[in-house]
């Protein structure tokens, strides 16, 4: 309904991210299908960022939107699930009619990926590599299962349990009051000063209902996350 209401004369499509950064939440399959049907009815394009798709922890999610039809544009990367951050290597799946157009754009932006990056990417699909990535995904889930409840207990409330990626999107309203500040920007600065814990304030993620939210990353080790909670507890408990 929101997509339908927002569609205007100049609208050409919808850009989605699932799982998303900063919330780590995914679009439910039924909701994604409904969105795509609205876009299709208007003759538009559904473009979806699936870069964190491999780091899904709920069986209800973790399935590519490409299953909805051949008119989906999917963007993905080797950076997250395949742990090749910094190699700047990814892929895009587009409808057949768009291939030649995308090729012209691509060859004027980056020509092609480096040889060493392509060989490294091929190694990602070896059984030994996949086993390592799946073990790593389980570790991310364990960190989430520890970190999110601990934040909630300290008054850094998580509105929706993340089902993917490695982030915690927390409302710092109550915690900021305990530190004598207001808003997420002042809160993260005070948090850094008191605990040496770095979090990302709302302003990096747009302006829609974000003013009292901050993002933590759970990409650190379990030991580091436990230490972070211990430091937060000393200030907020």
Feature-to-residue mapping (PLM):
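PLP-dependent class I/II
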Residues: 1-237
